[in-house]
Amino acid sequence: MGEDALANTLAWWTLLRGIAVFNVLAWSLAAWWLWRLRDRWPPDAWMNRRWQLALSAGYVLGCGYRSLWPVFDVQRLVLVDSFLSSVLLGRSVATVAEMCFAAQWALLLREMSREMSREASRTEQHDRCSAAVAAVSRLLLPTVAVAEAFSWYSVLTTSNLGHVVEESLWGLSAAALVASLLLMWPRVHFHRRPLIALWCAAGAAYVMYMGFVDVPMYWARWADDEASGRHYLTPAQGLVDVSMRWVVSHQWAHWRGEVVWMTAYFSVAVWLSIALALVPRTVAPSTDAKA
C-alpha cells in the first residue's frame, strides 16, 4: 500500500473526527441557546423543541460514534481493530441514530400540520392538506423502520438487494416529506418560505441522488454478485459474523467509494438535525399568509 494512499485514508478519518467534535459543540451551543430563550416559547412549542433537541442528540452522538469507528458494513471493513468497530455495534448505533433523525422530521410535520389546522381558515381544501400532512408524519417512522429492517437484512446476509429496498424507501420518505412541505406552502409565513424552499430543494436533490445514483449502485452490486455466484449468509450466520469478524484496512481503494456519502452524512445531515431543533414557528396566521 502506497504512503500517499495511506495518508489519504488517515486524513479523511481525521476530518471525520474533527467534524464529530464540531458537531457536539454545535449541539451544545444550540441547547444553550434554546434554554436561554425558553420563556419565549408557548408550552407546546417548547415541548416540541425539547423533543427535537433530544432526538438530535441521538443523531449527533450516533454519527460521532461512527466517525470515530468507521465501518464498511457488507465488506466488514474497519479502520480500528476493536470490538467498538464491529459491524454489530456500528449498525445498531446507526439504526438508533437514523430513527431519531426520522422522528425529528415526523415531529416537525406533526407540529406544522397542527399549526395549519389551528390557523387556516376552515375550508375543505385546507382541512384536506393538514390531514394529508398529519398522515405523512405518522407514516414516516414506520416506513423508516421497514427500511432499517432491510438494511439489517443486507448487512447480515451480505446481499445488496436489501439495500436496494432500503434506499428506495428512504427516497420515498423524502419525496413524501417534500410533497408535505409543498402542500403547506400557501399557509407558511412569508418570511419562512425561503427556509421551506431550501428544505424542498435539498429533499428533491436527495430523492434524485437516491433514484439515479444510490439505488442503481446497489442494484448493480447485487447483479454482479448474482452473476459471480456469490454465496450469501443466512441471517443467523450473519449475526455471528457481524459480531465476531472485522477486517482492518487503511487502503484508500477500499474506502474511496464511501468517502463522499459518509462525509456528507456525518456533517451536513447532522447540521440539519441540529437546525431542526431551532426551527421557528412556520405557519402564519390566516391574515399574514401570502399566496
Predicted regions and their residues:
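Hydrophobic transmembrane alpha-helical segments in integral membrane proteins
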Residues: 2-27
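Aromatic-anchored segments of alpha-helical transmembrane domains
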Residues: 59-65, 141-153, 203-212
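C-terminal transmembrane-bundle signature of multipass membrane proteins
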Residues: 21-33, 177-291
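Internal transmembrane alpha-helix with an interfacial aromatic "cap," most often the third helix
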Residues: 28-38, 67-74, 91-116, 122-137, ...
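Helix-loop junctions on the outward
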Residues: 43, 61-89, 155
